[in-house]
Amino acid sequence: MTDDFRWIDAPQGRLYAQRWPRPADGAATPPAPILMLHDSLGCVALWREFPAELARATGRDVIAYDRAGFGRSAPAQAPLPADFIAAEARDSLPALQRGFGFAGFVALGHSVGGAMATACAAAQPEHCQALVTISAQAFVEARTLAGIRAAREAFARPDQFERLARHHGERARWVLDAWIDTWLDPAFAGWTLDATLAQVRCPALVLHGEHDEYGSPRHPARIVEGLAGPARMMLLPGCAHVPHREAKPAVLEALHGFLGAPAR
């Protein structure tokens, strides 16, 4: 299996993207790929081995990309625009479809990437075959803000900030400030995912850690309640904000079942 690295021209600049091909099975028509959208401090590299394992578990190509300003992609404007969640569906998704030559897709996102995946599903209901959210926020909760404030204190330590800089280089400060300043801004306090959820008709799997430090189980419950299509919530016991690392076997098993891949 050979990974496929590409530079994608998008309205916000060049995006770094990578594809992990599905195992060869001789199928004449391959299933729609899974498009992965990372969290507020994430990038392609921070998915680690999960995309390759996901491709094997589901029998689908997996595509992940660095949003503008993150990882290896072009720098982004500061601060984040007010519509930064919807912008991924409007600008990045069509560019990735052109760059990799796909139309139909499965949207999968972690944390704020889950909100962006939901926006992609809402923007292209004719193409999005399924939605998966992992630890996604549906509104601004006191626990979310407390978790971000605690992270701000943690990243004040040089060793913690250096870990972020390993993946984002000289843009690490922008990445951190964009996350903290956006979510702690009083103007963002009324944000919800409700209107977007109501436009999603495809099947959805909503995964959430029982002890997520950035969001209570009220978030996945609200997501499932707000979606227009069939949805299932899976609360992962003992997990915090990163279930695909903390409970990887359970997450892969759930995704294998949800996306209907044949046993391998």
Predicted segments, located by residue:
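Alpha/beta-hydrolase fold catalytic core
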Residues: M1-L35, G59-R60, G260-R264
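Conserved HGGG/HGGXW glycine-rich cap/lid loop of the alpha/beta-hydrolase fold
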Residues: W20-P75
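Flexible "cap/lid" loop of the alpha/beta hydrolase fold
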Residues: T118-A123, H127-D159
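Short beta-strand/loop motif that positions the catalytic acidic residue
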Residues: V200, V206-H208
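Short alpha-helix in the alpha/beta-hydrolase fold that links the catalytic acid
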Residues: C202, S216-E225
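Acidic catalytic loop of the alpha/beta-hydrolase fold
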Residues: H211-G215
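Catalytic histidine-centered segment of alpha/beta-hydrolase-like enzymes
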Residues: C239-L252
